[in-house]
A protein has these predicted regions:
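Calycin-type beta-barrel ligand-binding domains and close structural analogs
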Residues: 8-37, 41, 65-207
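N-terminal glycine/threonine-rich, aromatic-flanked beta-hairpin/loop signature
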Residues: 44-74
């Protein structure tokens, strides 16, 4: 379990800059969907927003849609990235990056396409968002500059399809990212999400 120290989140952090550079962009699971029809062709967009808000964190608008309905994303979120330190089991102090999940107000489709046109979020402020407590992903940077992490235990509540909690496992690297989101019932049985493994999102190169 991570235990954050009192080290300031406001200090410059090159690891944060690296993480943001890897997360921001356009991604697709098309290659995975072609190879295995149990996976859908999903497009993932992440765009940095609200720069200079002064809280020391980074905000990302996040949008996921099937390739056949790009104008109707099925998931829209705002991630708030911060960093702190924690002590590992051997007592060593290490850096951890926390990706909080925030929900948009009202009808999220009003903001569809905001990754390409961030001006759609100009009138929206962080104070209008609602946080999904316990659903933050805790990421650690490896020696090769990649990141990996997950939600903690059963902290992320969910009532979707009979679930009582959800879990997310994430890996981020220069080629893209993998995400494995699953829901579990009170007995620990998986009730939604991929049963074959993580979705593999490859970075889409500018044409």
């Amino acid at each position: 379990m991570f235990v954050a120290t009192q080290k300031s989140l406001m200090e410059p952090d090159p690891g944060m800059a690296k993480l943001v550079s890897l997360m921001e962009g356009s991604f697709s699971s098309e290659a995975q969907a072609v190879a295995d029809h149990d996976f859908y062709d999903i497009r993932l967009e992440m765009k940095r927003i609200w720069e200079g808000k002064g809280d020391g964190g980074v905000w990302l608008y996040v949008e996921q849609a099937t390739a056949t309905a790009l104008d109707k994303p099925y998931r829209q979120r705002v991630y708030h990235l911060t960093s702190s330190t924690y002590r590992s089991g051997d007592g060593a102090e290490k850096r951890v990056f926390v990706s909080e999940v925030w929900m948009l107000p009202g009808d999220p489709l009003v903001y569809a396409g905001a990754a390409a046109d961030p001006s759609k979020l100009d009138k929206l402020t962080p104070a209008e968002l609602s946080r999904r407590d316990g659903c933050e992903v805790w990421l650690v940077m490896a020696a090769d500059g990649t990141f990996a992490g997950s939600t903690l235990g059963a902290s992320c509540g969910s009532d979707r399809q009979g679930a009582v909690y959800a879990s997310s496992m994430v890996k981020v690297n220069p080629e893209g990212l993998t995400t494995w989101d699953r829901g579990f019932d009170a007995s620990g049985k998986q009730v939604w999400g991929s049963v074959k493994g993580a979705y593999e999102f490859k970075r889409r190169r500018a044409e």
